[in-house]
Swiss-Prot record:
This is Type II secretion system protein C. The keyword Cell membrane applies. One of its GO terms (biological process) is protein secretion by the type II secretion system. It is found in: Cell inner membrane. Residues 1-27 are cytoplasmic. One of its GO terms (cellular component) is plasma membrane. The keyword Nucleotide-binding does not apply. The gene is pulC. Involved in a type II secretion system (T2SS, formerly general secretion pathway, GSP) for the export of proteins. Required for the translocation of pullulanase. Residues 47-285 are periplasmic. The chain crosses the membrane at residues 28-46. Keywords: Cell inner membrane, Cell membrane, Membrane, Protein transport, Transmembrane, Transmembrane helix, Transport. It comes from Klebsiella pneumoniae. It is a single-pass membrane protein.
Length: 285
């Protein structure tokens, strides 16, 4: 390739199911990248610049809520996404919402953005074949229940006077043939339960320039094989996903809304001063 070319495309395809886990490398690494970037976007959305240290399990509720020295600036809401063992917003009506039973309503939650400011919390739910963004006080698709609280891993609704919980990714159990989940899904479940395990596969750190997010630095973790199989290289700087700028709050929210439906992914990274598109086709044929 000549030095004058500014773009480079790396193509990886996932087509053969039930092979060794390395065949799922693009899917797995992409799942990790999306999971962690969403975590970071949630924390950095409102320009709260907090150092991330996964070795100290920075995603635990203790770290996220530990007292800080008073600031001269007005306190901004903190956001979390997926898996934080954070208490449900105290401003929500009702009793102990953590004890709300799982709802039998056939509703699917595909994304949650929890906030210490309830008015800024967002739930993404399926409505037919489309996804809608809802907040506390809104009715669920179909109007059967009303949203009263949004937690990092569940939605609390009031249905016929009773508080019920709708878990994130509330998929009905698969029936029929062998329905074992692919490694990428197992990995996503593992990371939601133990986010610190990301370090085994990938190190991602936000890069700030003049107090502005300029991208996410990607490096291999303790298990570098999956990182290299995906087409990534050390010190790649992720800046966009499917043409949406990961550094922009509104575009990042669009990425979050699209995550459950993505089948093809183009991750744009800066490498040695040039932009590179890494194409990942996530197909089971």
């Amino acid at each position: 390739m000549s030095k004058g070319i500014k773009m480079h495309n790396s193509v990886m395809r996932l087509t053969i199911p039930n092979k060794k886990i390395i065949n799922y490398a693009p899917h797995i690494v992409t799942s990790i990248i999306l999971f962690f970037i969403c975590q970071q976007l949630a924390q950095l959305t409102w320009k709260i610049i907090l150092p991330v240290n996964f070795t100290d399990n920075a995603l635990s509720s203790a770290d996220m809520t530990s007292p800080a020295a008073p600031s001269a600036e007005t306190a901004l809401p903190r956001f979390t996404l997926f898996g934080l063992a954070e208490k449900t917003s105290a401003s929500a009506p009702g009793g102990n919402l953590d004890q709300a039973p799982v709802s039998a309503l056939r509703l699917r939650v595909t994304g949650l953005l929890a906030s210490t400011d309830p008015s800024r919390a967002i739930a993404i739910m399926m409505k037919g074949n489309q996804q809608v963004s809802l907040g506390i006080g809104d009715n669920t698709p179909g109007g059967e229940a009303k949203i009263i609280a949004i937690s990092p891993d569940r939605l609390i609704v009031n249905y016929r006077g009773r508080n019920e919980a709708i878990p994130l990714f509330n998929d009905p159990p698969a029936v029929g043939k062998n329905s074992a989940a692919p490694p990428a899904r197992h990995l996503a479940q593992e990371l939601r339960a133990q986010p610190q395990n990301i370090l085994h596969y990938l190190n991602i750190s936000p890069v700030m320039v003049n107090d502005k997010l300029s991208g996410y630095r990607l490096n291999p973790g303790k298990d570098p094989a999956l990182f290299r199989q995906s087409g990534l290289r050390e010190n790649d700087l992720a800046i966009a996903l499917n043409g949406l700028d990961l550094r922009d709050k509104e575009q990042a929210r669009q990425v979050l809304a699209q995550l459950p439906e993505l089948t093809e992914i183009t991750l744009t990274v800066e490498r040695d001063g040039q932009k590179n598109d890494i194409y990942l086709a996530l197909r089971d044929e």
